[in-house]
């Protein structure tokens, strides 16, 4: 057997074992049988709210079991083909089988990471905010590089994205942006990316070729479901309208279609300029505000709001989560998990899966630095 194929088989088998244990497939199978009996009872609909809860649980379990069973079935099918190709010395088929194992190992690793999702909101869409730190041109450029990195990361995971709001820098890059990430488990994949990111490189904007350090921060919060009620009093809101801006601060609309909403009690601000309609921008900004307030409330309940707010707002040395060094050597290191890689180009192109997996695993084990 080829070494490459052997390694892929070993990795997939390990992933299947971990997924089996993490999801507790046996218990899920038993629970699904119970739910099928409960939902088949016509009297269930006498209590519509309870019926909806049970149906959501049933759908969630069915999805988990289907994903696991499909992965296991595909693995067994390819193993069978590989055994026949080995006997027949069919090298062309073996080449294809090696690629099939490679693709399957990526899927298995993704599912293994998703087993670490523990919050109900992990399955939701999410919003990602990026804000440049102090430093003008350097930090604005770094913020735009981060935006590209996260857009690529979302694309790698099969998520759709929508740029809700973006404020361009005076010369290059962006001062800030808000991206809506659309897809099942989006928040689970992005939530550990919240914090301050530090870049060290030879400045492309400095004629002397000096090495510069730049900071930018990111904050992630889940889009909340419609059935979660967030009460916001009109008297607590300040709503401002303005013209949407383009590069260099140029106005791209002749009407005040962009909307900024401030929740006065918490000083929480959202804004949207992605649509030409002021009404639609206001609705989106309000939806973002509800999501932000929900996130803040959840943080308070878990006694982590102080830490999260520090990560969000303090673009300084003391609150970093990750360092990206491009010169004099190349390394990206997560300061929480110590996971690092020299593939700086890959990371900036959105290859962040290993960083996310390491953070989720650390949180699951409780071994926080």
Curated annotation (Swiss-Prot):
Post-translational modification, as annotated: Methylated by PrmC. Methylation increases the termination efficiency of RF2.
Principal subcellular localisation of the protein: cytoplasm
GO molecular function, one term: translation release factor activity, codon specific
GO cellular component annotations of the record: cytoplasm
Superkingdom in the source lineage: Bacteria
Subcellular localization, as worded in the UniProt entry: Cytoplasm
Keyword Protein biosynthesis assigned: yes
Keywords: Cytoplasm, Methylation, Protein biosynthesis
Protein's UniProt keywords contain ATP-binding: no
List of residues that carry N5-methylglutamine: 250
Pfam families named in the record: PCRF, RF-1
NCBIfam families in the record: prfB
Note: The gene for this protein contains a UGA in-frame termination codon after Leu-23; a naturally occurring frameshift enables complete translation of RF-2. This provides a mechanism for the protein to regulate its own production.
PANTHER family in the record: CLASS I PEPTIDE CHAIN RELEASE FACTOR (PTHR43116:SF3), PEPTIDE CHAIN RELEASE FACTOR 2 (PTHR43116)
Function field: Peptide chain release factor 2 directs the termination of translation in response to the peptide chain termination codons UGA and UAA.
Protein family per UniProt: Belongs to the prokaryotic/mitochondrial release factor family.
Protein name: Peptide chain release factor 2
Natural source organism: Rickettsia typhi (strain ATCC VR-144 / Wilmington)
